[in-house]
Every structure is written in structure tokens, then in C-alpha cells.
């Protein structure tokens, strides 16, 4: 089962999402360039029984993929608390509370530090173009020898002290869950 959370916070079926987003209905598509048959999405469906997709994130991913001009490798999408704990135990830089756990994050791997930096720069423009606030995580992963970029559209009240890219935020958002 695929559930899409709209930007208004409403949960809708894949079929309703496809109709709203102009994707062929009854297909495996969750975006113009992404489908449930892709490795990571299929794995999340198998692991959790449900694939949860955030409208803002998929619109961002689609536009970024369109501008990038070649496929993007999704290496992390949804995560359970158990999966997050496994990553921490294994020594990965994994937050206690991650936007991946609330279906608002994606890690895209380019296979190259240089291309990841280029993708992150392109993402800034895409987010601005779409009017979507996005957080970008890159440098700490590059320093650790990774080649992926973390993107999330998680509201700042979930992420104390981690503002959206280039955006200030109200002080009251600092009373939040730490991750």
C-alpha cells in the first residue's frame, strides 16, 4: 500500500495522488521519475508493508531529477525507529529522531563527492522555484567518505537548531524534539 501525505497534511491513496499529480492511474509511479518498483521504494514496501510519501518531497525530487537530467539513486527513504537504532549501533551518523522516520526525507547518492556538491547547489534553486523549504545535509557526509546528499522537508519544530536552507525561523520553534 502507498499513502501520500499532501502538503495540507491529508493522507490520500496512490490512485488519488496519481490523479492529482497527473500520473497515469493504476501504475507503479509515485512521481514523474520515481516508482514503487525501484529498489529502495520496493524495499520499504517489503519491510514496512506501506510506503509513505510526502507530496512536497516527491515534487522536489521530481523537479530535481528533471533538472539533473539523469537518474538519481535513492539510498534512504522511510525508516522505522528500529532501523534508525540499528544505524546508530553500527556507528553511522544517524540522529535519534530523523525526518526519515516521519516520511519527510530522502538521501540521494550520486557516487561522486563533486556531483553531490553540484546536486546540492542545484537543489537550492529547485526548492526556491517550487516554494518548498528544504534542508540539505552534505558536507558532514562528504567528510566521512560518503557520496550522498540528505534532503528533508521536515518542519523545523522537529529539528531544533537545524533551520531550512537559507531560511530563518521563529524562536518558539526551538522548543522541540531534538534529533
Residue ranges: model-predicted function:
Residues 1-65, 127, 144, 154-179:
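Extracytoplasmic cell-surface/polysaccharide-interacting catalytic and binding patches
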Residues 49-50, 67-71, 110-113:
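Generic structural signal for short, solvent-exposed loop/turn connectors between secondary structure elements
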Residues 45-47, 77-83, 120-126:
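N-terminal start-of-chain detector that recognizes signal peptides
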Residues 94-179:
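Catalytic cores and adjacent binding grooves of peptidoglycan-active enzymes
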Residues 52-55, 83-89, 127-131:
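A short linear-motif detector with a strong N-terminal bias
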Residues 58-91:
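Extended, low-complexity, intrinsically disordered C-terminal regulatory tails
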Amino acid at each position: 500500500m502507498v499513502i501520500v501525505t499532501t502538503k495540507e497534511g491529508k493522507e490520500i491513496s496512490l490512485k488519488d495522488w496519481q490523479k492529482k499529480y497527473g500520473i497515469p492511474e493504476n501504475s507503479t509511479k509515485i512521481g514523474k521519475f520515481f516508482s514503487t518498483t525501484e529498489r529502495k521504494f520496493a524495499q520499504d514496501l517489503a519491510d514496512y508493508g506501506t510506503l509513505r510519501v510526502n507530496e512536497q518531497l516527491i515534487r522536489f525530487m521530481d523537479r530535481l531529477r528533471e533538472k539533473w537530467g539523469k537518474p538519481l539513486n535513492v539510498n534512504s527513504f522511510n525508516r522505522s525507529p528500529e532501523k534508525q537504532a540499528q544505524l546508530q549501533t553500527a556507528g553511522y551518523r544517524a540522529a535519534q529522531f530523523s525526518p526519515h522516520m516521519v516520511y519527510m526525507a530522502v538521501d540521494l547518492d550520486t557516487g561522486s563527492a563533486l556531483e553531490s556538491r553540484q546536486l546540492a547547489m542545484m537543489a537550492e534553486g529547485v526548492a526556491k522555484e517550487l516554494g518548498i523549504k528544504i534542508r540539505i545535509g552534505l558536507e558532514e557526509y562528504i567528510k566521512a567518505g560518503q557520496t550522498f546528499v540528505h534532503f528533508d522537508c521536515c518542519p523545523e519544530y522537529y529539528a531544533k537548531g537545524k533551520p531550512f536552507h537559507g531560511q530563518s525561523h521563529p524562536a518558539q520553534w526551538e522548543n522541540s524534539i531534538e534529533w
